[in-house]
UniProtKB/Swiss-Prot annotation:
Biased composition annotated in UniProt, kind: Polar residues: 1-18
Name of the protein in question: Capsid decoration protein
GO BP of this protein: viral DNA genome packaging
Disordered, as annotated region: 1-28
Gene transcribed to yield this protein: D
């Protein structure tokens, strides 16, 4: 009897910049897969999925899938990520908006 394993390599980093993670209170309203951009909800002071409309409001990228029951989120607070690997919201309708989502943070999109 033989066993066949399949390995799929997944490396979302776009270059050799270090990627660091952190944790913060979560305020998600639905399931969110890893690589979802996050922003700070100023009224609840919790991380939520980026709305896709506010330039420079994204502060991190979700590192581990989470949902509305997740009280703490693990997210990338720095690093360089490939444009095509980030799970952009539908409201982020053009490339410029996506590339400037993290303006002023330690996250770069290539």
């Amino acid at each position: 009897m033989t066993s066949k394993e399949t390995f799929t390599h997944y490396q979302p980093q776009g270059n050799s910049d270090p990627a660091h993670t952190a944790t913060a209170p979560g305020g998600l309203s639905a399931k969110a897969p890893a690589m979802t951009p996050l922003m700070l909800d100023t009224s609840s002071r919790k991380l939520v999925a980026w709305d896709g409309t506010t330039d420079g409001a994204a502060v991190g990228i979700l590192a581990v899938a989470a949902d509305q029951t997740s009280t703490t989120l693990t997210f990338y607070k720095s690093g360089t990520f490939r444009y095509e690997d980030v799970l952009w919201p539908e409201a982020a309708s053009d490339e410029t908006k996506k590339r400037t989502a993290f303006a002023g943070t330690a996250i770069s999109i290539v």
